[in-house]
Amino acid sequence: TKEASRRASIEGRSNQKIALDTALGRGGFSADTAPSNCLVAVPDSSGGWSVGEDLNEARNLSNKIQGRRTTVKAVSPIELPPGEWDAVLKTNWVEPGYLETDSAWCEPDGEPSTPLANGGAFGSKLESLAPEAARSLANKYRRPVLAILSREDSVRLGPKRPPIAGGVNKNGKGIIRVARTPGIVSAINSVAPEIEVEEVDISGPATSSTIRAAGWAEAQILLCGALGKVGTIYSPDGSSASAQVDEKQINISVRCGLPLNETVLRSYCIGAAHMAWSWVTSESLTVDENGEVQDLTVRSFGIVRAGEMPEVNVEIEPDKGKPINGSDAVFTAVAAATWIYKGTLPEWPIGR
């Protein structure tokens, strides 16, 4: 299990634990490890936190009306750059949709538990509000406090992948317009130095460049679209992946150093393929003119059900090098292959 946990930590970019306890439902998430005498805090309707003796009391004090999904169609928030391009693409707002919502607990004058715990959310929880809330409230009430977000809270308050609108040519040159986000320009230029990046201010939720392959994936996908083929995708980490896609199968090849545990590596690659296929074909969030997300339930994110996915086959190429992340390259390769297979339509999601 040591090597399995190490591979999981590399792919999830946070400390992960794989053991019998996990299979038995004791995964070690922050909420699972909180002391029994914790107060519970949840976001309230005014931008603060409601605190109660248990989750039910805290939610009753929050005075929030449960959100729903909207019937209003999602619209890509950024316009394409002018010019003649071999490939163009506009992406939409999407929800990271991680399994375990944000939580952290803290003792008075202590350090908060990490919301990453045993689930890294592929970078989406790195800027979570929960740890600082738990710390400040524990110091205020002089009792341990568990700060926990509902699914709706995570959608409203959590950072999103920066939407882009770009055009590129076969020679590798082009323009990508992207929601202004710290670190996003360097992420794009790390794989596409000939692409000019224009950051734009748009109304919407917070964005983050720490979310899985943000920026550099979109740049490589656009370049693949311009060439009309995927070839081999190289990640900034140095891993490589290729993918072939049709309605029935997604075939993947990945090289990412010593596998450590092929079962774990394969599972992360299958998950990355699912995330990529779903992102390209089905996912979106409606954001209103005030920048508020209107799709607030799990079923409104557009995530493709696992049973509706093409079959995913993973070939792990032999490699005795240093173990590095491979699933981000797989994510990018499958997204590019899916887009090309579906006809490189200019706006995502393209539909199934």
Predicted features along the sequence, with ranges:
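Conserved beta-alpha junction segments in alpha/beta enzyme cores
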Residues: 19-38, 79-110, 117
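Glycine/serine-rich anion-binding loops at beta->alpha junctions
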Residues: 114-127
